[in-house]
């Protein structure tokens, strides 16, 4: 079975796909929003230029681009192996797990470079299988971190060590109806942290937000983006008739003020490989040499069990190989682009103004991307790509079910009610790759319709256009999303 999987991951299907264009005529929807003449670039099959793959399988996210050859291919495979390797708590090679952690490998949460089923729908809290496929971020209500816990509650621990806390999830449901009478349901999850390692934290002084893993689709292209183009999008991202006004999140990464691109709130300027190994798995490295529970009794308990915390768990070269692996992943091509239902759905996507934030076309800078060790990847440069994102942050509202998507968590300039526009490329294969259709930052949306109907704030007008479509038009828009 292992060899079959490897063959499937290496196999690529090449095809010639024609590009076509069609026009959406000017119209006015039921909310009075005027949709101007827009050229709908139907047929954007080559999602990532020369980094596009044509796989339609469970490994569609987990393949190198065609230009990954020679020593790059060797390093890609080494990085892939480290990404999927199950860490243990011993002192040997590929050990170093814990003492507390959230997942035991990158692949435990990002299965096949995608997103493992959220704990919200699997274990309804801290998992019993050594990982929970979620991160629990906490702060005081004044924004400060708790001394005993830092920014993340690690709900898993190695043998003999107590987790920092456990999470219980309860869900509230509410049924709504489209104007044509068709019902839809939204789920609002509520999180409770119990079994605290140290002093219990009063809910009155606690902000808690949960993140499920992101798909690792198009990471290299994101890092190669023309930053000036993104800043220009922010400068002109002002559509008062739609209530849309996106902006950049600037953060300090590696001591330099940079444009944030990665993460739910665009809170990172690189792929944060070392941070993931440290914060998620407790695996120390040259950037994060201290254990994540430094100062807690867990460190002493581990030492008493014969574990050593004096040497790093991961070498710099290993981190660089994982960084290269993530940069070199290819992006699945669009499928069924000539299907009439998909074409109609693409028209509905534009009619609803979805393209104003989920920007169809962007470009990478001439020099491509640069790895942690300074290695240049020029093959990522000068590419026309179709991520369906502006990589800007937008107010997503607080009004739905009394809470909306506001999690009160501030990241750089990004406020609690603001989120980065999620890149949609590859999203139509998530069911095939990961076996579920859970979307949004904590997986509360169980399908495309629920994800759309959770849009508030700057997404409210577009949501209302979708809401007032006919059932046929809504179904067509969903078919278009499945094609991405």
What is each model feature region?
Residues 59-97, 321-350, 364, 369, ...:
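Electrostatic cytochrome c docking/interface patches
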Residues 16-23:
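Bacterial N-terminal signal peptides
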Residues 6-15:
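Bacterial N-terminal signal peptides that target proteins for export
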Residues 54-55, 61-75, 85-319:
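Extracytoplasmic redox metalloprotein regions
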Residues 101-113, 216, 322, 345, ...:
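The canonical Cys-X-X-Cys-His
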Residues 73, 112-115, 156-193, 312-334, ...:
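C-terminal capping alpha-helices of c-type cytochrome domains
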Residues 24-48:
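Bacterial Sec-dependent N-terminal signal peptides
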Residues 186, 197, 201, 208-209, ...:
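C-terminal accessory segments of proteins
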């Amino acid at each position: 079975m292992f060899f079959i999987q490897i063959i499937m991951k290496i196999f690529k299907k090449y095809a010639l796909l024609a590009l076509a264009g069609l026009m959406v005529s000017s119209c006015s929807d039921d909310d009075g929003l005027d949709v101007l003449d827009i050229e709908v670039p139907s047929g954007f099959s080559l999602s990532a230029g020369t980094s596009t793959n044509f796989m339609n399988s469970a490994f569609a996210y987990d393949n190198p681009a065609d230009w990954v050859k020679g020593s790059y291919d060797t390093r890609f495979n080494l990085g892939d192996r480290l990404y999927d390797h199950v860490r243990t708590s011993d002192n040997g090679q590929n050990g170093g797990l814990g003492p507390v952690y959230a997942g035991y490998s990158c692949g435990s949460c990002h299965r096949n470079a995608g997103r493992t089923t959220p704990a919200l729908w699997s274990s309804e809290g801290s998992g019993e299988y050594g990982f929970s496929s979620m991160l629990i971020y906490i702060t005081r209500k004044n924004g400060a971190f708790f001394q005993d816990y830092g920014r993340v509650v690690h709900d898993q621990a190695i043998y003999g060590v107590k987790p920092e806390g456990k999470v219980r999830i309860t869900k509230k449901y509410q049924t709504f109806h489209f104007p044509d009478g068709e019902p839809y349901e939204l789920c609002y999850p509520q999180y409770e942290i119990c079994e605290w390692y140290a002093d219990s934290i009063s809910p009155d002084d606690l902000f808690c937000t949960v993140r499920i893993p992101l798909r690792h689709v198009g990471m290299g292209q994101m890092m190669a983006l023309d930053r000036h183009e993104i800043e220009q999008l922010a400068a002109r991202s002002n559509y008062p008739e739609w209530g849309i006004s996106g902006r950049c999140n600037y953060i300090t990464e590696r001591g330099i003020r940079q444009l944030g691109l990665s993460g739910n709130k665009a809170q990172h300027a690189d792929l944060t490989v070392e941070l993931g190994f440290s914060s998620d798995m407790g695996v120390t490295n040259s950037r994060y040499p201290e254990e994540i529970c430094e100062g807690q009794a867990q460190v002493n308990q581990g030492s008493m069990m014969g574990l050593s915390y004096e040497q790093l768990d991961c070498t710099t070269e290993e981190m660089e190989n994982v960084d290269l692996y993530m940069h070199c992943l290819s992006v699945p091509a669009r499928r069924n682009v000539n299907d009439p239902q998909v074409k109609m759905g693409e028209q509905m996507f534009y009619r609803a103004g979805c393209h104003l934030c989920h920007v169809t076309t962007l470009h990478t800078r001439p020099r491509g991307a640069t790895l942690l060790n300074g290695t240049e990847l020029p093959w990522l440069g000068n590419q026309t790509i179709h991520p369906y994102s502006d990589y800007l942050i937008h107010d997503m509202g607080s009004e739905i079910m009394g809470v909306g998507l506001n999690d009160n968590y501030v990241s750089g300039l990004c406020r609690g009610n603001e989120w980065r526009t999620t890149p949609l490329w590859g999203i139509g294969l998530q069911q095939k790759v990961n076996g579920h259709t859970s979307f949004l930052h904590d997986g509360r949306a169980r399908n495309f319709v629920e994800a759309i109907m959770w849009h508030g704030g700057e997404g409210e007008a577009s949501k209302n256009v979708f809401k007032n479509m006919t059932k046929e038009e809504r179904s067509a828009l969903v078919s278009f999303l499945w094609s991405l």
